[in-house]
């Protein structure tokens, strides 16, 4: 009897264990199915978002593309056929907050002058019909893709010629590489996805505009062009992320289009082996030797380290490398990018003795403040970028300058 009860109890325990194990297995399978379904739904939703994003981005690009091409073509024709008829060269003294001729005679150097610069210098307004697609981009990306676009929807610059006429002597090109049938070309725009409206879509056309103005103003102060190669692309029309072959092709375009106006790293270095050696000697070239010239600087974002590796001597390169402060010991670096003027002010003792060319941003559209402007004027930077430069377009908006001038001496 006892044995029977024991066996019955043992069987019950065994059955209970089997039942619990079976339920656990069943529950595990249910959880697995829920996880699998959740992942499927997530990836389907992600695919829908990405597809919607790509469709909207492509639509914005193509809406702006035709207008960009037509604008640049008509602008170059206007300059050639109308603007320069009876043209009077710009008086460089009129844009300088100092006696220019005296400074030239005294040998004032490139790094002893501050130039007012524009940021994303080819910026135009997106076509109105693109806004619905931009809002779609904003929606499907939860506001991430559009960035600050809607804050900047009224932000635009004069043409490059207009900026040069207003005394701007430093401009910026954000550049995308495009490959078609093996041929590499370059497009200038702030952002291929949401901000592709530009007055200078084709790089060669942009350089042609600069060279044409330079030819009509042969004794102008040096023009500094900051080039930022984009590290991401929209998979459309053969756009590619910058690589070694793209940068080599870019240098070739600069040499072809700028010709003897290009003031190369080799021109700047003279007999020095590196920019570090040249800076220690505080021997940047005098302005007088740079009149009528164009200096091209490669922005630290993207490709600088690989660009330097192509030729560490910089003798065959077309652009002067820029770096961030933390990379200041790079021997080939001539420029430092300090986007925040307060950082440059905090490091002012370093910049006073290191003899770098420094680029900072005085404002960021639509935001500006007198405090930041004061820091920009104090920080010893030679390239001071503003989104509120003197201009013809939108004259009702705020304007920043050096008390009415666009070039000033730096007091070290």
Question: Where do the language-model regions lie?
Answer:
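Catalytic cores of phosphodiester-bond hydrolases, prominently lipid phosphodiesterases
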Residues: 19, 35-38, 46-412
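N-terminal Sec-pathway targeting helices
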Residues: 24-46
């Amino acid at each position: 009897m006892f044995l029977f009860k024991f066996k019955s109890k043992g069987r019950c325990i065994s059955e209970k264990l089997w039942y619990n194990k079976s339920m656990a297995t069943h529950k595990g399978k249910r959880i697995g199915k829920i996880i699998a379904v959740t992942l499927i739904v997530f990836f389907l939703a992600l695919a829908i978002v990405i597809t919607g994003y790509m469709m909207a981005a492509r639509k914005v690009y193509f809406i702006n593309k035709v207008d960009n091409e037509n604008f640049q073509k008509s602008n170059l024709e206007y300059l050639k056929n109308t603007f320069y008829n009876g043209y009077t060269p710009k008086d460089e003294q009129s844009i300088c907050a100092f006696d220019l001729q005296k400074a030239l005679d005294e040998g004032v150097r490139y790094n002893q002058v501050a130039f007012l610069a524009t940021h994303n210098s080819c910026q135009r307004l997106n076509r109105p019909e693109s806004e619905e697609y931009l809002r779609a981009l904003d929606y499907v990306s939860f506001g991430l893709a559009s960035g600050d676009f809607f804050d900047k929807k009224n932000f635009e610059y004069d043409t490059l010629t207009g900026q040069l006429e207003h005394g701007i002597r430093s401009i910026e090109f954000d550049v995308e590489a495009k490959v078609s049938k093996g041929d590499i070309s370059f497009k200038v725009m702030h952002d291929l996805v949401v901000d592709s409206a530009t007055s200078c879509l084709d790089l060669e056309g942009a350089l042609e505009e600069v060279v044409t103005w330079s030819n009509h103003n042969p004794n102008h102060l040096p023009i500094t062009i900051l080039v930022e190669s984009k590290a991401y692309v929209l998979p459309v029309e053969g756009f590619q992320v910058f690589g070694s072959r793209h940068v080599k092709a870019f240098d070739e375009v600069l040499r072809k289009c700028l010709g003897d106006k290009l003031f190369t790293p080799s021109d700047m270095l003279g007999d020095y082996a590196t920019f570090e050696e040249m800076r220690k000697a505080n021997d940047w070239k005098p302005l007088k030797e740079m009149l009528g010239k164009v200096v091209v600087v490669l922005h630290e974002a993207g490709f600088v380290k690989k660009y330097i590796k192509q030729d560490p001597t910089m003798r065959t390169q077309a652009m002067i490398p820029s770096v961030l402060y933390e990379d200041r010991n790079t021997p080939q670096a001539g420029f430092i990018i300090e986007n925040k003027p307060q950082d440059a002010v905090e490091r002012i003792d370093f910049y006073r003795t290191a003899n770098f060319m420094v680029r900072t941003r005085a404002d960021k559209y639509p935001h500006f403040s007198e405090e930041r402007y004061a820091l920009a004027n104090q920080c010893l930077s030679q390239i001071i970028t503003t989104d509120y430069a003197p201009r013809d377009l939108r004259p009702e908006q705020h304007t920043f300058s050096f008390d009415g001038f666009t070039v000033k001496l730096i007091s070290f």
